[in-house]
Amino acid sequence: RPLNVPINEALVSYEVDGEQVNGIIVQPSPGEAPYPGVVVCHPHPLFGGDMNSSVVIAICSALAHRGIASLRFNFRQSVEGEKLNETSVRDVETGLQMFDGWEMVNSVRLGVVGYSFGAAAIARASTSLTSARALAFVSPPVAAIKKSSLGDDTRPRYFIVGGRDRLVDAEALSEVVSSMKSQANFETLD
């Protein structure tokens, strides 16, 4: 699709465990609904990460220009120090369920993508994200990927890291991904 395709954005709010989660649904327009859909998870809130992260917005925009709807949301107080906890996992699970139920999204063409902390949350929640047909990870923490069950996952998985990323060791991530079962792809961007 050409890059000049108009994009519609809508603020959404939904409940997770009795608390409000705010998000934005980005929908390509014009387009033929129901759209494929992707839930996009942001980097660590303690380091300024939220749904308006430049990388998250770029991902959502790129998806919309390709005819794919997206949901990005702000994690609730999802951290204990710098650690991931079950709150962030529930936020991803519920966001995907909510998006799956949206009439403009094709429920058999869903995926999830996470950036940094968001990638770790998806890795931890991956076994419960059964409606996601594909998983993507941008600069994921290597330890989170190692600890997850992604190695045995049979869905398509895509891992991408910048060649000059100071937090993610591209070589270590490449080794972890290469040991996974089928459909796991790794790319380093320079």
Model-derived features: positions:
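Catalytic histidine neighborhood in serine/cysteine hydrolases
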Residues: 71, 179-190
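Conserved alpha/beta-hydrolase "acid-adjacent" motif
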Residues: 166-172
